[in-house]
Amino acid sequence: YPIVIDHSACFNHAFKHMPDLEINDISEFLCKFVVPRLDITKCDERVIVHKQCKIKVLGKSQYIEDLARLCSDHVFNIKSFACDGFAGQKGFFTPELNKVATKDLASEVAEYGATLGVSSSSTCEIGLGESGGIPFVSVAYLLDRCSKAKK
């Protein structure tokens, strides 16, 4: 199996700086290696997907959306910003970055009737949850909630 990194910004750094290693973002790993071994039952959540800016740059953002669509028939992509501004740990020390970047997220959540947000960056999830007014969790938690191992 490849190396799996459960934080997209860290994945981006490792992917760029260690080209000889097979490294997957958590969403890509789950799609390629875990999903085929699962029985998935869709949930009733209305899921809004945060495609972390670093995985978008690498062209790997489709994996998180694919996972969300396996788990729910009601999936929406965030359109009100390209980057949430949390910027790794900077959001802890300069929360204004996140607040300004995500100022329209609560309206977007309300427009879609979203009840849960998913991401692949734990620090982004903190700011997104505060700004959006709904829980944002790792997409791995959503997949776990909607699946069981095939027999």
Cite the ranges covered by each PLM segment.
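Iron-sulfur cluster-binding electron-transfer modules in prokaryotic oxidoreductases
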Residues: 1-151
